[in-house]
Amino acid sequence: MSSGQQVWHTAVPPPRRSSSIASMPRSPSSAGSPRSPGTPGSERVASPLECSICFSGYDNIFKTPKELSCTHVFCLECLARLAAAQPVGRPGGEAVPCPFCRQPTAVPPAGAPALCTSRQLQARMPAHLRREEPVWLEGTKLCCQPLPTTPGREPGFVCVDVGLSKPAEPPAPARDPAPRRGRLARCWARCRDWRRMALVSALLLMLFCVALWPVQCALKTGNLRCLPLPPRPPATSTAASPLGPLTDN
């Protein structure tokens, strides 16, 4: 008989990892920061003070940081473009979906400028950009009236079109003979005006000549008679006929 061989199994604990590696926290900015949507796999990370869609720095006019109900923050211009792209008349058309989590946010009746401004990011902006300028929506345009840079100058308006495309131009109306007759009538009226002006000018010229004619005559002839007097015939001496002798009766 062969004696059975006993094998003893000893549990070996797994090697412990370094505590410095296990306890290292993950950066929330690197985990939650979006990447550029145009280049997949790009390592560009959005700054907390710039929009994650257009990568433009926040300001106090059209790039005001607006916070959605999901606490994601984007600039006012990008949110206005998203709101303009929503279908009109459909359920949910009055809400803007978040580009990251797709959670809808109701748009106020005044439009995207009435959305909540992120005071947390606004407090981290430079001091001259913390005062939010009034921006309103006119149709598909974001409008603002910034203060003039020089004193005494009237403030102007600045507008940005956030619509998808420009409205189609109406077709040109077909031409009919009525406008042509209207043009002929206007031309005829102008011609009549010109004839009146010519007639008045001719009358004024005639009156001017009649008024200056005596002056011209006085300068040339020395009197107001323009035609020279006809020369007088020379005086002829008539010989007196001698009286004949008186005849006696």
Swiss-Prot record:
Record InterPro entries: RING_finger_E3_ubiq-ligases (IPR051435), Znf_RING (IPR001841), Znf_RING/FYVE/PHD (IPR013083), Znf_RING_CS (IPR017907)
Composition-biased stretches (Low complexity): 17-44, 235-249
A single GO cellular-component term on record: membrane
Gene3D superfamilies registered for this protein in UniProt: Zinc/RING finger domain, C3HC4 (zinc finger)
Single Gene Ontology MF annotation: ubiquitin protein ligase activity
Major location (coarse): membrane
Membrane-spanning parts: 199-219
GO biological process: protein ubiquitination
Membrane topology: Single-pass membrane protein
Cell compartment(s), UniProt: Membrane
Protein name: RING finger protein 223
Keyword Metal-binding: yes
Region (Disordered): 1-44, 230-249
A Pfam match: zf-RING_5
